[in-house]
Swiss-Prot record:
Protein name as catalogued: Venom allergen 5.02
Lineage per the UniProt record: Eukaryota, Metazoa, Ecdysozoa, Arthropoda, Hexapoda
Keyword Ion transport: no
Main location: secreted
Family membership: Belongs to the CRISP family. Venom allergen 5-like subfamily.
Cellular compartments annotated: Secreted
Coiled-coil residue windows: none
Disulfide bonds, paired cysteine numbers: C4-C16, C8-C101, C26-C94, C168-C185
Stored InterPro entries: Allrgn_V5/Tpx1_CS, CAP_dom, CAP_sf, CRISP-related, V5_allergen-like
Signal peptide bounds: none
Organism listed in the record: Vespa crabro (European hornet)
Amino acid sequence: NNYCKIKCRSGIHTLCKYGTSTKPNCGKNVVKASGLTKQENLEILKQHNEFRQKVARGLETRGNPGPQPPAKSMNTLVWNDELAQIAQVWANQCNYGHDNCRNSAKYSVGQNIAEGSTSADNFVNVSNMVKMWEDEVKDYQYGSPKNKLNKVGHYTQMVWAKTKEIGCGSEDYIEDGWHRHYLVCNYGPAGNVGNEPIYERK
């Protein structure tokens, strides 16, 4: 498998380690649903692009302090099935956290993850999970070296101007009586690179 040849800063590529099958690999956990529907893919993409536009136009009033400045330019994201496959294989492992190596031949790949847990079999809406990433903007100060990635890193990846493509995967499973809803989105090229600004201000 060609993914075994892809180099990352650390670890073996997710698709080399676990193979390219998108079947769940959750051990003793009971899988309720695996993967996103076409409709959910479209919703996630639309939500990202609408939020990127809002920020780029200078209409996001939240921040620390707000509002966020408008952007000189920001790519419109398109869906990428390869990024989605890599995200799905990782979600299938039911192991909440970031994988070590998820790059494609084309890009270094960034990642956002979210998990919702409910005690009953309640449906967790993917758009609410994406909204959690958007809401990190309340702690973000444009251009400040004091921003902490563990507080705002999902937001900054969402609006990283140079990112062009996105692909996501999900797993709904039961672990220790809890219903876990796990969402993984991969982004190419990756955001949150060194000291680069998330976007150039207008």
